[in-house]
């Protein structure tokens, strides 16, 4: 009989008993697709809630523009890192159409997966902005964190800034999470590195273009608040930045690997029916 125990009771260490191994139970394609969709929806919901909330919090407290930029960047970077640790095991934790596009162009995800990831992100951003709207009194909503261009800054400059900041974020994603296929040790530092890239981008762009780096980060709050000023900048800039990052990574930075057979090594056949316990 297969014994099923809750996840919290997993304490098995395969290194102490080499006669056993942990086997990940396969799931059907529809279940896998639903879990990926839901993880992107839930992660984007939280991300938009935290990002919009960070902007509202930054303007609700007294301080100069530099302090607000650092506070907003720190909250958003830490929130993204926490969410990657939380849900990256299911969908990879894109939470950003620009990151999804970069992963698609680099060959990490397929076209169909990319489409329903983006659909989940759009639904999640609306839900997250709606929850944020309900949490805050009117005097603190501040357009739910919809970014605005600084005085004297034109749309071309804002486009270039969003493109550059998003490209480094996508390069960081591709350089850490994509390479995890071959080096699982990067799983431990990838969320921190990606969160740090977002922190840097938001801190730089906060007082100029707004430092969105994510189209749905602006879309959800814009739908709920009705503020659409220069909205196209926050789609076109990150998308071009993602394309640029994917091109640089795939053509210049990506390492090439070949999978070869080990001489004299026969991979063991795994029969799930022989499991002594299930988790």
Swiss-Prot record:
Keywords: Cell membrane, Membrane, Repeat, Transmembrane, Transmembrane helix, Transport. It comes from Dictyostelium discoideum (Social amoeba). May form a water-specific channel. Required for prolonged spore survival on fruiting bodies. Belongs to the MIP/aquaporin (TC 1.A.8) family. InterPro entries: Aquaporin-like, Aquaporin_transptr, MIP, MIP_CS. CDD domains: MIP (cd00333). Induction: Constitutively expressed during hyperosmotic stress. Signal peptide: none annotated. Residues 62-69, 136-158, 210-227 are extracellular. The gene is aqpA. This is Aquaporin A. A motif (NPA 2) lies at residues 214-216.
